């Protein structure tokens, strides 16, 4: 007779494998429908219904196949201000179990003044979600990014990864890059980037970044509650563990690891705007049926990225909900790392800029701005904020408003707060 714990573990693994089976089956059904309606013989019996079935199959196969694949960065080159094309080579600067420090190396280019570390969210999507952000910064900056790994591919032997580990990763990456680095945190990592900087302020002051730009993140979720924060308060930790956490199945290297599955996260993302997504896929099927769709059309470019989801470790998800949203440890300035209090007021020499979107329905205006009230040791001359009119959550780090309004503000902010300290010798390869 199995022990209760063994039965529970098998239940969690069975649920994980069941979701993967459903995804795989839908991909197969789409591929089968597309193949069956593509036989030349079907042309002998012209029927609009066959075109619709073929289109449904093509869209379905593509959509479900993208859910388990990490997108490429697809940044082979960019055009600089002189109209010259520059090649781009993504290089791993620092490899770790749960994420790498990635540098977008530009061969033959003189090193740029601004060294930027983008802290990418670990919230269901890959760091490639910031592709357009990276591309927009390349002409003026040496760009680095946190490239987080899919938890399903990380063996259990690698250990845990929670909000404290995330904070320590950011601190290590900042140490590696040196004090002339400008940290730009986007959405979910905002409170942890603030904590990592405060951690360095006490443990290694010379490694603090020159500036810290915080874009639309939940420093104080209760400052302006949204559906996301309301959900965090409406469920208990026990309910979250029971309904959201599963164990990776036998198909992947992380077999047995407790995770918040990417497929489950995706279902939550889609349910928030179900009508909008249903309309988008219906319209795309119609375009494919009329032979008006393309491999790189607007729909495919967006959904190839949106549907590509990754598992996050259970302890990271649960500790984020409990410590950032429920207990508000960052907002109350009582966050700890390895038992040591991280005091945000210890930040005294790092310029901080807040970016928020007026129509942000994920991290509402005010949630990120709360960081400035915590920085009691920082002079007002080193504090700045910007509320972008009409911008939603994604609009503050991608799209037209980012390119035309927000990006120039950040570049100017970095220029005004640059440090001339020589680069860490260990990073001499950062010159591009």
Spans of model-derived segments:
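Alpha/beta-hydrolase-fold enzymes
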Residues: 2-52, 56, 179, 196-315
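Short, surface-exposed "cap/lid" segments of acyl-processing enzymes
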Residues: 76-154
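Conserved acidic catalytic loop of the alpha/beta-hydrolase fold
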Residues: 153-155, 165-182, 194-198
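Gly/Ala-rich beta-loop-alpha elbow adjacent to hydrolase catalytic centers
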Residues: 185-193
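Short beta-strand/loop motif that positions the catalytic acidic residue
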Residues: 347-348, 354-356, 360
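Conserved alpha/beta-hydrolase "acid-adjacent" motif
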Residues: 361-367
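Catalytic histidine-centered segment of alpha/beta-hydrolase-like enzymes
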Residues: 362, 388-404
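Catalytic histidine neighborhood in serine/cysteine hydrolases
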Residues: 372-394
């Amino acid at each position: 007779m199995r022990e209760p714990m063994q039965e529970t573990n098998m239940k969690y693994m069975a649920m994980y494998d069941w979701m993967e089976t459903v995804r795989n089956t839908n991909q197969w059904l789409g591929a089968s429908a597309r193949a069956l309606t593509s036989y030349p013989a079907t042309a002998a019996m012209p029927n609009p219904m066959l075109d619709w079935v073929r289109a449904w199959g093509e869209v379905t196969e593509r959509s479900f196949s993208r859910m388990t694949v990490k997108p490429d960065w697809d940044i082979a080159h960019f055009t600089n201000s002189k109209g010259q094309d520059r090649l781009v080579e993504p290089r791993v600067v620092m490899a770790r179990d749960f994420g790498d420090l990635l540098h977008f190396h530009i061969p033959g280019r003189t090193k740029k003044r601004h060294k930027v570390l983008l802290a990418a969210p670990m919230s269901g999507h890959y760091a490639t979600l910031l592709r357009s952000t990276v591309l927009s910064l390349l002409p003026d900056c040496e760009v680095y990014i946190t490239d987080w790994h899919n938890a399903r591919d990380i063996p259990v032997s690698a250990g845990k990864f929670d909000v404290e580990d995330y904070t320590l990763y950011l601190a290590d990456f900042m140490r590696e890059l040196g004090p002339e680095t400008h940290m730009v945190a986007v959405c979910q990592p905002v409170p942890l980037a603030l904590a990592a900087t405060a951690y360095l302020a006490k443990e290694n002051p010379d490694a603090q970044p020159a500036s810290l730009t915080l874009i639309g993140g939940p420093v104080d979720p209760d400052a302006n509650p949204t559906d996301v924060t309301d959900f965090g308060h409406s469920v208990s930790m026990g309910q979250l563990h029971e309904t959201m956490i599963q164990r990776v199945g036998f198909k992947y290297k992380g077999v047995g690891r407790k995770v918040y599955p990417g497929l489950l996260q995706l279902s939550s993302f889609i349910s928030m705007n179900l009508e909008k997504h249903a309309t988008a896929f219906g319209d795309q099927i119609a375009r494919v049926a009329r032979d008006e769709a393309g491999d790189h059309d607007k729909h495919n470019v967006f959904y190839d990225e949106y549907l590509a989801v990754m598992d996050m470790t259970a302890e990271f998800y649960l500790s984020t909900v409990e410590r950032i949203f429920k207990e508000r440890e960052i907002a109350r300035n009582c966050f700890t790392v390895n038992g040591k209090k991280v005091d945000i007021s210890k930040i005294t020499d790092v310029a901080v800029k807040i970016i928020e979107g007026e129509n942000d329905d994920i991290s509402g205006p005010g949630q990120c701005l709360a960081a400035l009230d915590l920085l009691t040791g920082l002079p007002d001359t080193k504090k700045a904020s910007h509320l972008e009119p009409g911008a939603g959550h994604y609009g503050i780090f991608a799209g037209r408003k980012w390119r035309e309004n927000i990006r120039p503000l950040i570049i100017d902010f970095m220029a005004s707060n640059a440090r001339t300290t020589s680069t860490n010798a260990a990073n001499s390869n950062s010159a591009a």
